[in-house]
From Swiss-Prot:
Any matching Pfam family: MP31
Official protein name in the record: PTEN upstream open reading frame MP31
Gene: Mldhr
Quaternary organization: Interacts with lactate dehydrogenases LDHA and LDHB; interaction with mitochondrial LDH leads to inhibition of lactate dehydrogenase activity, preventing conversion of lactate to pyruvate.
Coiled-coil stretches: none
Amino acid sequence: MWRDSLCTAAGYALGRRDAAALSSLLSEAAAMMEV
């Protein structure tokens, strides 16, 4: 999925700690869009 690759790319760019926060933010946004 494009979200997974985006999180991975962001993780490499920002570092693991920021990536975890970004990943959770993207999951929430994705959940809202799917509803």
